[in-house]
Every structure is written in structure tokens, then in C-alpha cells.
Amino acid sequence: VTDAMPPAAVPTSTAPTPTGTAPPGLTSTGTTPAPREYPQALRGPKHRWWRPLVGLGVTVAGLAVVTGALLLSVLAFVIAESMGAELPDPASDAFLVSPAGMLITNLGLALGIPLALLATWAQAGRAGLVSSVLGRVRWRLLLGGLGVALLLLVTLSVGTDILLTQLGFPAGGEDAGTGSSAGSSADETGLWPLTPASGWIALSIVILLTTPLQAAGEEYFFRGWLSQWIGSWLRWRWLAVAVPAVVTGLLFALAHGAQSPWLFADRLVFGLLASLLVWRTGGLEIAVAMHAANNLLAFGLAIAYDELAESLLITEVPPLDGAVSIAITILTGAVLLWWARRHDPDLVVTDPVLPEPMRSGPVAPAAMAPAYAAPGPVAPGPVTPSPVAPRQSAPGAAEDGPANGETT
């Protein structure tokens, strides 16, 4: 038996450590920031107490610009009329329900989209976070949700109208609080005969093209920027979910002006449900789809029965109509949430992990290994085999001699 000698220690060279100052903007500590849900999406690594104030300032300035533009347009109408031009009164119902009036109204409300994007960028540096936690619009959810919402709302609205009529309840008209007499000529199914007003083709085109933008503008402002702005002040998750939902729901309902309790409740429930959809899908897409489908159906029916002015200026609904509308809204939202969750949408913002900030200071020279200890297949002097076999034998080892550390 031969004496075993430990293998010679071979010093390894030490790689130089990068030194110097970090590139501008690289302030990460190397750890992954905690994932954030949509209401707290703006509480990212760059969040500071003053950043929400910047976003608020941009929003106020934007609203001031929009208001000023509207006032200038009204002033232009007044000046043109004083010079003898025959123009419709911009404050009249006739102008409101005209193609030009609907175009101005819808595009004015659609300005909520760029306003929310600009305010979000000013506050967090990522404008797309107001659309979804991925920082972009998820078009599959938006377009698919719009189709599902339209199918649901048409089916439920027509179905309940027929059902209520068969049960002896009024279906629209003066009894429905719209101020029209269409219900007096309703047929046995509860579906009114179509009586579109003149110019309905141009009006339908304007509504079809701009109503989705109008609905998106309201959602981007209320459920988007305003919800995230409130959530950026709140550290606790459940408060950041509940408080923005309640506040924006109330403001959304109040923004529609004077209204009866049932109409206010209907709009409040819609706002609360939209906030739930945004939270549980991680973005605005499903809420925008439900809002756009609801308005497209409402405006489409109003044009078909020449009741667009009554639909836009509605201030009250009877309890039955309000309760039915709330039930349809809740059922539609529940189905949309189920459909969206089947697509497994992202629910949290994930920030990229940045490397550790680089140390500043002189660069240390690399440690050099001595020449006599350089690794190689042959070491100086006689080599005595180790009694410990390697983890994996080289090819042919079994033929060269005993294995598993056996000696003879």
C-alpha cells in the first residue's frame, strides 16, 4: 500500500471587480421591488411624496386648457352670430343631438385619455401604467370584452323588456321616466316600432366611431388616473383598493348632474363595478368595454326611436327601471369578469431587477497566480495516485488499473 498525498493546492486568479460610479439613473439596490396591483401602480421605485402633486398639477392644467378651448369655441359662435351668420345655438337640445353636437361632446370627453396619460407620465415616468399593469393596452381583452358586453347587454335588455311587458309592467315611455310617449304604441312584445329622426345615418356614424372614445376617456380619468392617484397616497393594499373605488364611484355619479335617487344609485353601482373589474383584471380594458357597450346600446336605441335628447338629458327613472338596470349591470360585469379571468390577465406591476450600483474607487490589480502553481495536466515531481476515485472515471480507466481507491 502506498502512502496517499493530498492533491496540490492550485491558487486561482481573482477576477477584477468593476469599480467606478453607476450610470445616471441607476439607483436600484439589486432587489426586486414588491409587485403592485393596479390601484398602487404608481407607487414604484421612483415614488416620492411630491410626485402625486406633480400629477395633480398637470391634470389641473390640462382641465384648464380644455375648459378654455370650450369657452373659446362658444365665443366664436357668439361672434359669428353677431356678424349675421346663421348658426345653431350650442346650448340648445337641437344642437346637442345633431351630428356636430355629438361629435364635439364625445371628442371633448375623449380628451380624458391623453390627459390621464400625460399626468401618469409626469408622476411615474411610465404613461402606459394607466392602461394596465403591463404598461400598455391589452387589445385582446378590450376587443373581446366589447363583443361579449354588447352581446350580453342586447340580450338582457331586450329580454327583460319583453318579460316586463308580458308581466303587465310598462316598457318605456312616460311611465319609464323618459318624458316621451313611445310606450303608448308598444306592441305585444314590448319592442317599440322604429321611428328614427331625419339625419339618423350621419348621427349613427358619429356615435359608432366616437362613443367608444368617449367611454374610454371617462374610464381613463375616473378609474384610471384618479384611482391610481388616490392609491399612490395609500400604503395599505385594501385601503388603496376600497378608497379609490368609493371616491371615484361617487364622483362619477355626481358628474352626471341632477338625478333621481334610483338613477344616481344605478350610476354609482356602475362606477363601483368598473373599479372592481379594473382591480381584478389589472387594467382598464374590461371596464372600457362595458362602458362603451352600454353607451353604444343606449344611444343606438335612442336614435332608433328618436329619443336621443331624452336619453342624454335624463334626470330620473322609476324604481323598477332603476332596479332592472342595476341587475343587468351587475350580471354583465360578473360575466365579463369570468370571461376575462379565463384569459389569465396580469394583475400586478413587475419592475425589472437592476444590478447593484457600482462602487466608486480605484481599480485593484488582479491577483496573479505564480508560475510554478499554474494549473496543468502534469505537476512537478513524482505524482502519487490519490486513494479517492473521481466522481466520473475517464474512458478506459477500468483497463488501466484498480478502481474505487483499491490498492494492491
Located regions from the model:
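Cytoplasmic juxtamembrane regions at transmembrane-helix boundaries
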Residues: 122-143, 223-238, 243, 357-365
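Residue-level signature of transmembrane alpha-helical entry/exit and packing/kink sites
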Residues: 51-55, 98-109, 141, 145, ...
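Membrane interfacial helix motifs at helix-loop boundaries and amphipathic/re-entrant anchors
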Residues: 70-105, 158-200, 254-263, 303-323
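N-terminal, membrane-interfacial amphipathic/helix-forming hydrophobic leader that caps
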Residues: 1-125, 131, 315-408
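Juxtamembrane helix-loop-helix connectors linking adjacent transmembrane helices
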Residues: 103-106, 129-216, 227-228, 232-233, ...
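Transmembrane helix-loop-helix hairpins at the membrane interface
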Residues: 203-337, 341-357
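Hydrophobic residues within the alpha-helical transmembrane core of Major Facilitator Superfamily
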Residues: 57, 159, 250-251
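Membrane-embedded alpha-helical segments of transport systems
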Residues: 61-66, 111, 150-151, 293-298
